[in-house]
């Protein structure tokens, strides 16, 4: 089971047009204080300041906080989409991505960091799509990475009519998302799904080239 190794590269254009802060200042920041200064007056300022005031924190904590904030905001915006088909497609796509971000984090925490259940839960995105609460609890309670993978293979992502992976498949974010897009695009060929699938393929292709 592997992470997606995401890395963001900014070269102007789209990001600079749509960001509500000085993107170059953010990319040039060499400390958390400089980063906070670069986003002063935006929705990110209070989030980063709150974390900065915590007694114990690391750069990873900031990354987790921003990820959680992003996914919570996306999920909230999806609920506002008026077209039912589009809303359901977005829920399936982003819900699957959130499930697997949480699964990958739990796996890494168990395999590489030997973290306790409370610390793992602290960094989880509080949204679930196809993972039931009982399954998440069971996964959190596993004692080894091997046991964790065994339990993941018993979830809806591997079993039932809506399964997107085969039992022998390697557990990776890329594989899950590509399979999910394939299923959705086959069912909804004239929807927003093919556009999102194209963007996903561009992203995974760029990540593979790095």
Give, region by region, the residue ranges found by the protein language model.
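Conserved small/polar residues in nucleotide/adenosyl-binding loops
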Residues: 203-209
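Long amphipathic all-alpha helical oligomerization modules
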Residues: 181, 185, 189-198
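Alpha-helix capping and inter-helical loop/turn segments
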Residues: 5-6, 114-115, 190
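Non-catalytic, well-ordered alpha-helical scaffold segments
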Residues: 100-104, 193, 205
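A contiguous, surface-oriented mixed alpha/beta subdomain in the mid-to-C-terminal portion of proteins
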Residues: 29-182
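An N-terminal, globular interaction/scaffold subdomain
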Residues: 1-2
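Short, recurring structural edge motifs at helix starts
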Residues: 88-96, 193-202
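Long acidic/polar interaction regions in large eukaryotic complex-forming proteins
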Residues: 5, 9-27, 144, 152-155
């Amino acid at each position: 089971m592997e992470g997606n190794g995401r890395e963001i590269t900014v070269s102007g254009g789209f990001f600079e047009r749509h960001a509500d802060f000085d993107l170059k200042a953010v990319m040039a920041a060499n400390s958390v204080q400089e980063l906070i200064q670069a986003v002063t007056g935006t929705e990110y300022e209070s989030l980063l300041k709150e974390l900065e005031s915590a007694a114990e924190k690391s750069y990873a904590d900031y990354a987790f906080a921003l990820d959680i904030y992003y996914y919570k905001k996306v999920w909230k915006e999806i609920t506002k989409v008026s077209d039912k088909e589009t809303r359901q497609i977005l829920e399936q796509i982003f819900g699957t991505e959130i499930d697997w971000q949480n699964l990958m984090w739990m796996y890494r925490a168990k395999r590489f960091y030997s973290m306790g259940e409370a610390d793992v839960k602290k960094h989880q995105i509080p949204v679930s799509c196809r993972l039931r609460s009982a399954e998440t609890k069971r996964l959190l309670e596993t004692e080894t990475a091997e046991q964790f993978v065994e339990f993941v293979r018993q979830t809806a992502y591997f079993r039932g009519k809506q399964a997107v992976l085969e039992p022998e498949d390697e557990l990776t974010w890329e594989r899950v998302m590509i399979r999910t897009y394939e299923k959705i695009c086959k069912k909804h060929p004239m929807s927003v799904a093919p556009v999102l699938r194209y963007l996903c393929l561009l992203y995974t292709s760029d990540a593979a080239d790095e």
